[in-house]
Amino acid sequence: MTSPLLRRTTLAALLLALPMTLHGQGRTAPNALPAAERPFGTMRDQAAMQQRWLKQRLDTFLPALMRKHGIDLWVVPMREYNEDPVFSSIVSPETFAARRRTIYVFFDKCAATKAPVTSTCVERLALGGTSQGGVFETKSSTRPVAAQPGGRQAELWGDEQWQLLKAAIEDRKPSVIGIDRSKTFAFTDGLSSGELQGMSEALGATWTAKFRDAEALPLELIASRLPEEEAFFTKMTELVWQMTQTMFSDKVIVAGQTRTSDLVWWWRQRVNDQGLGTWFQPSIEVQRQGVADVGEDPVIMPGDVLHCDVGITVARLNTDTQHMAYVLKAGETDAPAGLKAALANANAMQDIAMEEIKPGRTGNEILKSVLDRMKAKGINGTMYSHPIGMHGHGAGPLIGLWDLQGGVPGRGDAKVIPSMWFSIELQATTPVAEWGGQAVRMAQEEDMIVGADGKTRWSLKRQNSLFLVKSQGK
């Protein structure tokens, strides 16, 4: 057994060996992680970038959306660890949870006079918590407390917060008060029962009569993305492509030895090693000639068709990607023509989807158009695409679900807006002659951008050819 002294000495040595940043100087000690292993910079770099994005979003998107949806004052109360889904879209990257109770208040002071929307139209108040890097005006308690270093004041607490909210509303006299309540969208249903009750009791009938479900306001604020975020998202997508191409290669796969679970954990480990996150457990699927069910965690063999569903999370943004690969048999240099034709059918569906997704259209309208055109081309497939951004399955219209191809009531009725991102997720099933007519499913997913101008483009590109895995391994 190691002695306590030796254990302390060893621990000290390990701590000294850790990467160190010189406090307040932005300089990194020589033994820090190489920049090549930090594809998106340091945490400090990312936080500064996210803070700029936050201010830009609140200065640009929020005033326009409040006016568009007729919300004079939007109130967003929440308690620690029971945050509203809009929380991550309105707070600093240095804030991880609400502080005790936090009430965010947004007031369109230009609405009453119908003045043009500008970045200065919306007042932003934080009744509790911090200014979120200077983007909110904060209010503190007037309760006396024992002297604190630096003259620190008491924090707002209990009924005092509700009364301060009431005073703020009475001063501003809004005609419409938006609250986050919805039976349709989880993203716009963030007002808890307890907070609604407490707020209603404090405000009284005069002001609660002006409550209106904000619904589309938080939904579209969460969904709206800046051009600067688009550029960063493209870099994220580039990295995902690099990783899927490496995973689906003989650098990682040894045909006849590697199991699908090995690839799952290769992905998880590689994501972690680069300081990234993910929002779901990756999956790997195998289709094999003459085999209906390859079983759980099969060994990957020559001739297999491989499919992955993977994603990464960086700076509160998420990707969602599905790629396809073929494991070459001995003597093969390419995939069979039938498999390439099957992938081409999925590509044709992607082309249709990109043409049909336009601002102002609902998810259900887009789904119907895509499926009608797909069937006219003789393609057997399904579409189940979704918004992406601050959440993997993001705010906005669903374009089908895998088991609801006739449309998605409610969630499919939301409309596409400019500056929104989607994951175009779909599959085409095609008989393959080289496999004796066996149907092969080509499931693809690529992230795309609806620009501020309403035009669509891939975040990076889409997969036009199968990744090829050499079967001999390395």
Predicted regions and their residues:
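Bacterial N-terminal signal peptides that target proteins for export
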Residues: 1-11
